[in-house]
Amino acid sequence: MGKLLEVNGPLVRARLPQVPNGEQVRIGTLGLVGEVIGREGQEALIQVYEGTESVRPGEEVEALGHPLSVELGPGLLGQVFDGIQRPLGRLLEASGDRISRGIQIQGLEQARVWRFQPNPQLAAGMAVTGGVCLGAVPETPTIEHRILVPPGLSGELLELAPEGEYRLSDVIARLDMGDHRSQALTLSHRWPVRNPRPYQQREHGVSPLMTGQRILDTFFPLLKGGKAAVPGPFGAGKTMVQQQIARWSNADIVIYVGCGERGNELVEVLDSFPELTDPHTGRSLMERTLLVANTSNMPVVAREASLYVGVTLGEYYRDQGYDVVIVADSTSRWAEALREVAGRLGQMPVEEGYPAYLASRLAAFYERAGRVQTLGGSVGSVTLIGAVSPPGGDFSEPVTSHTKEIVRTFWALSKDLADARHYPAVSWRESFSDDIPVAARWWAEHIDKHWQAGRAEAMTLLTQAEELSRIVNLVGPEALSGTQRWILEGATLIKEGLLQQSALDPVDSFCAPEKQFVLLDLMLQIYHQGVELLEQGVPVQELLGLPVLARARRCKSDYKNTQVETLQDFTKEIKEAFGRLGREHAEAGKI
């Protein structure tokens, strides 16, 4: 026990000897949750994850004997937690629409009964170590929750519970730890959020995370286990892009962390996700989704904890052998929380008031992504996608610039594209992906070997069109040759028929990889056939007037993912239309 000495917003000072950094504490008569972040002699600096209004010096501070941690076990999926893993559904039942300060509710429902199936390969007397699977629980109809020996524990298995129904607190196994010590294991365990969960070794990424968004999958792919950033100014569509990724990505588990964003955006997520169907299983999307909601009107330092809570939950499912994608919206709000705490601590600010350790904290967070061989021998991955909200869209500000140096995939959102109603507003000029060589091998093996060449040609066409657009803006389209005008038309086809994608269109919202490549190939075929006719002397006006061009723009929404073969038949119609135009001019003597 200790005594509170000073209250400075979310930061308090207490006389609390012999309590290490990182330890979780309870503050005052309300029992507010806090964490020790520094020491000065016998005094501890504590950041408080709840509002400190009415808290006064002299109140008691209780050290809980463990760091800020989360409870890991069956029952996580489908839940909505706040920034310190309190379930919002049960908080609503306990305290109403406003979360009462100091309310204590465990992250997992303790009374719920789970059907446990022991691992048939284990028996009493066998040596087990951290990460070994003791058995499984059907958490949802599509996800099997594997019960693991917590990392750091090892010993001889004394007993393993038979198949049956158990609560989270029931003992399902006992380990002989040596020195006449035994350890009881239950369906759940706790893990400190700031400590990355261990693994055997890192593995190279081998397959892309397919999001169903054409500009991301086809032009700037991200590998499973990779790290990506989505920077963009206000109104550019960051939240919508991240929600689309969370909805449609081919990961096994999706964790959406709303960190300091507006409450109405998170309400939209909470309202829409339960009604969506997972395209990969046909079941409810919430059966593989976990939400951490920490809105802008919640205590600022809780934003900092919410990202660590989200990534720890992701690592837990990774250790079970699953591919996890974590969507963090947004890391800028997290960095602002660091700035506020650093300012109250009196630390020397650097760029734009951020603390000097901003870059190292960002790097440490993103380093928790990766594809790994787990302690249990399986392979799992955590893919981290963080939104960045640079003020005024300035990508040179500290959070964006440091993030750009860390990530391997950068999906830069453009205000100009958003203003032109081009969504997703991902800029093909400023975005990049370092994962293209590996992704190309996957596309060649599973879809088509010409993917990389087609992508490169489309990017070249878009770049050429950008240069020609500057000329058009200065002197008008009449200054361009027929070939140059056709380059502009080819780039427009790619933009409107491939890159633009409606999240509200039930057909176009998700695009399968097979359809993505056929659409890319279709646009390039139109361009190639037009170039051939131009070389034969056909006027560019004749090409621009072909009805198939308008139909090609609509293919993305006219053909479902199951109609790829029908879409391929349309390419034959295009060849016939261009061939017919060439023959007409030849017969008329115009060529």
UniProtKB/Swiss-Prot annotation:
It catalyses: ATP + H2O + 4 H(+)(in) = ADP + phosphate + 5 H(+)(out). ATP binds at residues 232-239. InterPro entries: ATP-synt_VA_C, ATP-synth_a_Xtn, ATP_synth_asu-like_sf, ATPase_F1/V1/A1_a/bsu_N, ATPase_F1/V1/A1_a/bsu_nucl-bd, ATPase_F1/V1_b/a_C, P-loop_NTPase, V-ATPase_asu. Gene3D superfamilies: 2.40.30.20, 2.40.50.100, Bovine Mitochondrial F1-atpase, Atp Synthase Beta Chain, Chain D, domain 3 (1.10.1140.10), P-loop containing nucleotide triphosphate hydrolases (3.40.50.300). It holds the Pfam family ATP-synt_ab. Transmembrane segments: none annotated. Keywords: ATP synthesis, ATP-binding, Hydrogen ion transport, Ion transport, Nucleotide-binding, Translocase, Transport. GO terms for molecular function: ATP binding; proton-transporting ATP synthase activity, rotational mechanism; proton-transporting ATPase activity, rotational mechanism. The keyword Translocase applies. It comes from the Bacteria. Its EC number is 7.1.2.2. GO terms for biological process: proton motive force-driven plasma membrane ATP synthesis. The keyword Coiled coil does not apply. Produces ATP from ADP in the presence of a proton gradient across the membrane. The V-type alpha chain is a catalytic subunit. Belongs to the ATPase alpha/beta chains family. This is V-type ATP synthase alpha chain. It comes from Nitrosococcus oceani (strain ATCC 19707 / BCRC 17464 / JCM 30415 / NCIMB 11848 / C-107). The lineage of its organism: Bacteria, Pseudomonadati, Pseudomonadota, Gammaproteobacteria, Chromatiales.
